[in-house]
Amino acid sequence: MEKDLFLILHNIRSAYNVGAIFRTADAVGVSKIYIGGYTPTPENPKVAKTSLGAENSVEWEKYFNTWKLVEELKSKQIKVVALEQSKNSRDYRQFKSKFPLAVVVGNEVKGLSSNILKRVDSTWHIPMRGKKESLNVMVATGVFLYKILE
C-alpha cells in the first residue's frame, strides 16, 4: 500500500486473534501496528504461531495508553477511526478512505471504551444479518481493512 495505514489493537484478549490480525495487516500493507493495553505482543508464542512470520514484516510498537496514542496521531494530521458498534457508528460500506489513516479495534467482548470513542474522528460498524451481534475481531478487522483498499 502506498498510503500510510496504521492499526491500533486495544485490549484484545486472544493471542491467536492478534497473530491473525498481523497476517491480514501484512496482506493489505499496514505500515505499523500499535499494540495497546493488555493486548499480547508478537513476543507471545501464540501470536507468533498464528502470524506465521508476519510479525517480522509489519512494524509494531507497544503503547499502553491508547487514548493518548489517538490524540498523538491526530496531532500529526492522521485521521483516526474506530471499528465498533455504537449508537453513533455508521455502516462501513459508506466509508471513504483518506490517508494517512489509523484504525482502532478493541476487546472481543467489551469493544472500545467511551474514553477512546470520544477521541476518534468517526466510528464505523459492520451490519449483522444473523442472530449474533458481531463478528470476531480478526474477521471484522480484515473486512474493514479490505474496504479501505477499495
Predicted regions: what is each one?
Residues 117-150:
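Structured adenosyl-cofactor binding patch, chiefly the S-adenosyl-L-methionine
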Residues 38-40, 108-110, 128-132:
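Short, acidic/turn-prone active-site loops that include or flank metal/cofactor-
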Residues 20-21, 46-47, 93-95, 115-118, ...:
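Short amphipathic alpha-helical segments
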Residues 16-17, 90, 111, 135:
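Residues that form or flank phosphate/diphosphate-binding pockets in enzymes
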Residues 1-86:
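RNA substrate-binding interface of SAM-dependent RNA methyltransferases
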